[in-house]
Every structure is written in structure tokens, then in C-alpha cells.
Design a protein with these regions (language model features):
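Pre-Walker A adenine-sensing motif
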Residues: 1-7
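Residue-level preference for the first positions of well-ordered beta-strands
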Residues: 11-13, 36-37, 67, 99-101
Length: 148
């Protein structure tokens, strides 16, 4: 049941403060699927899409993999260009019913696309709608385990 989001086009959205185990949980969830997966920090994906970027990280490859893990959504500088690139990746996966696991320090939910503390405020209403469709959200809490 915990991996039921795999059956649809949904995402597994993991949010929480720094150091609460979001990345660790995301990779464990991807491995638990038993399917091929790719893991990339969002900033690296965006850097790779710029001219002269890493040719191994292509939109086609990100769209085709069974499960994609995008780490630290919202850490990128929000521009129209980054919003367009992220939307193209998420939308293509959504259209092809491919699950995506996403980690973020931002809060899930919210009803305003103008509050940057919420994921919707950081990525915009259009992208957030795709992420929310059929998704499971999980908010982690606690102290930064790397500082303990």
C-alpha cells in the first residue's frame, strides 16, 4: 500500500527541514519499487540542460526511466527558464504515467502561488497541479541528524 502511487501518474512528495532523512527515504522508496530509477538533485538537472551541460542527463532520459527521484526541489533559483524546464520534465512523466519521487524543504499544500515557503509558491500553480495529481505527501520533522 505504501507504494500505491506507482500504479498511477502520481508523485511521492517528501518534505521536511534540512537533515531529516528526505533523500535517504526517497532512495529507499525508489529501491523498494524494484524498478530502474535515476536520482538527481534538481539543480544538477537544470545545470545539465544548459548549453554545454552534462549530455547524460537529457529530458528524454529523465522521461523514460521507470522511477525518477528529484532531490531538493525549490533549492533552484526560480526563473521562467527553470519553471519551464521543470514543467517539461514533470509533465512528460505525468502524461506517460511514470511516477516521480521528489524531496523538498518547502511545505506541501497551501493555496497561494505567491508564498515561497510552500512548494506551490516556489514552482507555480501549473507545475504544482501536476505534482499533486495522484500524489502522496509526507512531511518529516525533527532535528538535523547531520548535526547530532
Amino acid at each position: 500500500m505504501a507504494l500505491s502511487w506507482l500504479e498511477g501518474r502520481g508523485s511521492f512528495l517528501i518534505s521536511g527541514p534540512v537533515g531529516t532523512g528526505k533523500t535517504h527515504l526517497a532512495i529507499a522508496a525508489a529501491r523498494a519499487t524494484g524498478k530502474q530509477f535515476l536520482f538527481f538533485p534538481v539543480v544538477e538537472v537544470l545545470d545539465a540542460m544548459r548549453p554545454g551541460g552534462d549530455e547524460l542527463i537529457t529530458p528524454a532520459r529523465l522521461a523514460a526511466v521507470s522511477v525518477l527521484v528529484l532531490d531538493d526541489l525549490g533549492a533552484e533559483k526560480p526563473t521562467d527558464w527553470t519553471a519551464d524546464r521543470l514543467y517539461s520534465i514533470i509533465n512528460r512523466r505525468w502524461l506517460e504515467y511514470r511516477p516521480t519521487i521528489i524531496t523538498t524543504n518547502l511545505l506541501l499544500g497551501g493555496t497561494s502561488s505567491s508564498n515561497p515557503a510552500y512548494l506551490m509558491g516556489a514552482v507555480g500553480e501549473r507545475l504544482y497541479s501536476r505534482l499533486a495529481d495522484g500524489s502522496i505527501g509526507l512531511r518529516l520533522s525533527g532535528a538535523d541528524r547531520r548535526r547530532a
